[in-house]
């Protein structure tokens, strides 16, 4: 059994590196794998606050910035987070961090960690590409908000959390174009590919370990959003 998890940078490092969370997250994963050592997990790390701080700084330094430059900066932040998570998952993670899901790579351990890839592609997109590569029909997206909302909850007090949504309706919310540093519930390009692949996605606040454990145990009584075709 394989689980593919997008671990948002805002979960790893909301204001500072979330050491206790990473320990608890590791404990949950180790427990799940030790129940059946054939189980495997792929973790794709986002850049989060670190990426946005560097990107925002660069935009101020060079107002004539190009989006590819911003993406390259953000990708490096995902790689830093990936190294931290990869090393934290020893001894069940023994393979090198993957930065290109289109290439062949080793997956000898129980846990594989991946980072950002190249300009124009978010870690959401990479998560969906891993699902395609391994013929998995579902993914888990761990973010720092409880659910997907019908509009930005940081801007609108009347934003409503959605327990279920289709990929088509999500596309209407997130739009069709990806911009570096975007703080969307899911990357628009990844949304389009996920619809094509008929994926099921669980989106939830990764900081709530007990809630995440419900998803691991296939208990649909969790706080979050399920995305389906």
Language model regions located:
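C-terminal catalytic "cap/lid" subdomain
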Residues: 1-229
């Amino acid at each position: 059994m394989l689980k593919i998890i997008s671990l948002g940078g805002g979960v790893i490092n909301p204001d500072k590196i979330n050491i206790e969370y990473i320990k608890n997250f590791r404990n949950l994963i180790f427990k799940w794998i030790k129940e059946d050592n054939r189980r495997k997990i792929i973790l794709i790390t986002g850049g989060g606050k670190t990426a946005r701080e560097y990107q925002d700084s660069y935009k101020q330094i060079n107002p004539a910035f190009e989006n590819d430059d911003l993406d390259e900066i953000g990708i490096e932040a995902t790689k830093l987070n990936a190294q931290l998570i990869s090393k934290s998952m020893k001894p069940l993670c023994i393979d090198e961090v993957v930065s290109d899901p289109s290439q062949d790579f080793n997956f000898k351990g129980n846990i594989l960690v991946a980072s950002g890839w190249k300009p124009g592609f978010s870690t959401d997109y990479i998560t969906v590409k891993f699902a395609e590569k391994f013929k998995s029909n579902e993914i888990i997206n761990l973010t720092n908000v409880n659910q997907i909302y019908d509009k930005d909850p940081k801007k609108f007090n009347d934003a409503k959390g959605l327990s279920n949504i289709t990929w088509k309706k999500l596309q209407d919310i997130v739009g069709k174009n990806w911009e570096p540093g975007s703080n969307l519930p899911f990357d628009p390009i990844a949304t389009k590919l996920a619809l094509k692949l008929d994926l099921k996605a669980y989106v939830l606040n990764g900081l709530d370990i007990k809630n995440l454990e419900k998803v691991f145990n296939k208990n649909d009584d969790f706080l979050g959003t399920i995305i389906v075709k």
